[in-house]
C-alpha cells in the first residue's frame, strides 16, 4: 500500500519505519530540512515508561493558581481570545477528577509499557546508539507533602504491574550519588527502575537512515497545504511542490495536526504547550546525575545524556509561539544548579518546543471518519516515550491487522 506519513519527528519516523517493515511504500513529508528538528530536537531525554501521568489530575486547578504567582513556576499561562485554547483548557479541567485520572493514567501506562517492549526490540534489531541509559527515573520530593501525595501514583503503578520503589533520603542518594551534596534539600523519591534515557534527536536521525535503507522516501523542505479528500476517502496530500497520491495518510504533525484536520470537520483537541530545555556540558561528573531525576517542585527533568546534562520542563500555554523566554531559562538553571551543579552553565544551549497536548494526556492513535486517514499525534511530553509502541499500533491499524494491545480508547472517537 502507498502510505504518506506527515511529520518527520520521532512519532512520524518510527511510524514510517514500522510501515516500511510491513511492506508498505512509504513517503515522509516535513517542512524542515531534516528529521527531528522541531519538538523532537532537544526534549528532556527521558523515556518514562513508569513515570507517566496525565497533567490533568486531582488538585491541579488549585496548584495551578499557586504556580501562577511563583518566581520559578512550572506553569505559565498567557491567556488570549483563542477558542481552541479556551476549549482545551475547559476539557482539561474536566479531567481533573480522581475517576478520570485513574482511567487516563491506566491507558497511558498500557501504551508506555508496550512502547518499552517495542523500543527494546527496535534497539536489538537496529543497533542504534543514542546516549541511552537503562537506569530508571527518580521522582524527587523536596517536601513530605509531595512524598505523601505520590500515593495515588504508587496505586496506579501497582494496579498496572509497573515496577516501582518508594525511597527515603538515603535511598535517593544510593540511586543518584551526587545528591549527597544536597541531602538536606530532599526527603525522598519514587523510583521507576524500568525507565530509560536517551537523545531523541540522535535516535530519530539514525532510525530515519534505517528507514531510507528500507525504501522510505523523505520529502524534506516541503510545506503541507491540505489533505486531498474525495468522496469520504483520502487520496493524498497537496504540498507547495506537488500533489502526492496515496492510499493511506498518517498525520503525525504534533501541535499542527488540528490545523490540517479542521477543514475536514475533524475536531482534534490537541493544543501546543511550550516546553523549554537547556543542554549543558558536564564539568564535574561527581555532581552530575547518572540517569533522570524529576524535580517534583518545579516539574523539571534533569537527565544524563553522555557527557551532557539535559534539563527540560515547564508548561507554557501561549499558543503557537516559539520565542525563548529568559525567565524560563532562569528556572531551568535554578533547578539544575540547586541539585546537580556539575555542568558548565556558561556553555549551555537554550531551546523551546511545542508539545502537542490532549486534555486527558493520552495521545490520539487510530482511524478517522475519512477512510484511509489515520492519526498518530497528541503525545504531549511523552512522544519519545510512546513513539515505538504508537508506531506498532499504526502499522497494525493501517494494514488492517489486529493490534497487540487494546487501542480502541486511544482513537479520536473517545471525544465524542
Swiss-Prot record:
Q: Where does FAD bind?
A: 3-17
A Gene Ontology BP annotation from the UniProt entry: D-alanine catabolic process
Name the InterPro entries on file. DadA, FAD-dep_OxRdtase, FAD/NAD-bd_sf
Q: Which UniProt keywords apply?
A: FAD, Flavoprotein, Oxidoreductase, Plasmid
Transmembrane feature ranges: none
GO (cellular component) term, any one: plasma membrane
| GO terms, molecular function | D-amino-acid dehydrogenase activity
Q: Which residues form a coiled coil?
A: none
Q: Per its UniProt entry, what is the enzyme's top EC class, as one word? A: oxidoreductase
Tell me which cofactor or cofactors this protein depends on: FAD
What EC number is given for this enzyme? Answer: 1.4.99.-
On the tree of life, the source organism's domain of life is: Bacteria
Annotated NCBIfam families: PRK00711.1
The UniProt function text for this chain reads: Oxidative deamination of D-amino acids.
Instruction: Read off the PANTHER family from this record.
Output: D-AMINO ACID DEHYDROGENASE (PTHR13847:SF280), SARCOSINE DEHYDROGENASE-RELATED (PTHR13847)
**Which HAMAP family does the record cross-reference, listed alphabetically?**
DadA
Question: What family does this belong to?
Answer: Belongs to the DadA oxidoreductase family.
Please give the name of this protein: D-amino acid dehydrogenase
| Source organism of the structure | Rhizobium johnstonii (strain DSM 114642 / LMG 32736 / 3841) (Rhizobium leguminosarum bv. viciae)
| Chain's gene name | dadA
Amino acid at each position: 500500500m502507498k502510505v504518506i506519513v506527515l511529520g518527520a519527528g520521532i512519532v512520524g519516523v518510527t511510524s514510517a519505519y514500522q510501515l516500511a517493515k510491513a511492506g508498505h511504500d512509504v513517503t515522509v513529508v516535513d517542512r524542515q530540512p531534516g528529521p527531528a528538528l522541531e519538538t523532537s530536537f532537544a526534549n528532556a531525554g527521558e523515556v518514562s515508561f513508569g513515570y507517566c501521568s496525565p497533567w490533568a489530575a486531582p488538585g491541579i486547578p488549585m496548584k495551578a493558581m499557586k504556580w501562577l504567582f511563583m518566581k520559578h513556576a512550572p506553569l505559565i499561562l498567557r491567556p488570549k481570545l483563542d477558542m481552541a485554547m479556551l476549549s482545551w483548557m475547559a476539557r482539561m479541567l474536566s479531567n481533573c477528577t480522581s475517576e478520570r485520572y485513574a482511567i487516563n493514567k491506566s491507558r497511558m501506562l498500557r501504551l508506555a509499557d508496550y512502547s518499552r517492549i517495542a523500543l527494546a526490540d527496535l534497539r536489538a534489531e537496529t543497533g542504534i546508539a543514542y546516549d541511552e541509559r537503562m537506569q530508571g527515573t527518580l521522582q524527587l520530593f523536596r517536601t513530605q507533602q509531595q512524598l505523601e501525595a505520590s500515593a495515588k501514583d504508587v496505586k496506579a503503578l501497582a494496579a498496572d504491574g509497573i515496577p516501582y520503589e518508594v525511597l527515603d533520603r538515603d535511598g535517593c542518594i544510593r540511586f543518584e550519588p551526587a545528591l549527597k551534596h544536597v541531602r538536606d534539600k530532599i526527603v525522598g523519591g519514587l523510583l521507576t527502575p524500568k525507565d530509560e534515557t536517551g537523545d531523541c534527536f540522535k535516535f530519530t536521525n539514525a532510525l530515519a537512515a534505517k528507514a531510507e535503507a528500507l525504501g522510505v522516501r523523505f520529502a524534506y523542505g516541503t510545506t503541507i497545504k491540505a489533505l486531498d479528500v474525495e468522496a469520504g476517502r483520502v487520496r493524498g496530500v497537496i504540498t507547495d511542490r506537488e500533489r502526492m497520491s496515496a492510499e493511506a495518510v498518517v498525520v503525525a504533525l504534533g501541535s499542527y495536526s488540528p490545523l490540517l484536520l479542521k477543514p475536514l470537520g475533524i475536531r482534534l483537541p490537541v493544543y501546543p504547550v511550550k516546553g523549554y530545555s537547556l543542554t549543558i556540558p558536564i564539568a564535574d561528573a561527581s555532581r552530575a546525575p547518572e540517569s533522570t531525576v524529576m524535580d517534583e517542585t518545579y516539574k523539571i527533568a534533569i537527565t544524563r545524556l553522555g557527557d551532557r546534562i539535559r534539563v527540560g520542563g515547564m508548561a507554557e500555554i501561549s499558543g503557537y509561539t516559539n520565542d525563548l523566554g529568559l525567565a524560563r531559562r532562569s528556572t531551568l538553571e535554578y533547578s539544575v544548579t540547586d541539585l546537580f551543579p556539575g555542568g558548565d552553565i556558561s556553555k549551555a544551549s537554550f531551546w523551546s518546543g511545542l508539545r502537542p497536548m490532549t486534555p486527558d494526556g493520552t495521545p490520539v492513535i487510530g482511524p478517522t471518519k475519512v477512510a484511509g486517514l489515520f492519526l498518530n499525534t497528541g503525545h504531549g511530553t511523552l512522544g519519545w516515550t510512546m513513539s515505538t509502541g504508537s508506531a506498532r499500533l499504526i502499522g497494525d491499524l493501517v494494514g488492517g491487522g489486529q493490534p497487540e494491545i487494546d487501542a480502541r480508547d486511544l482513537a479520536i472517537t473517545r471525544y465524542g
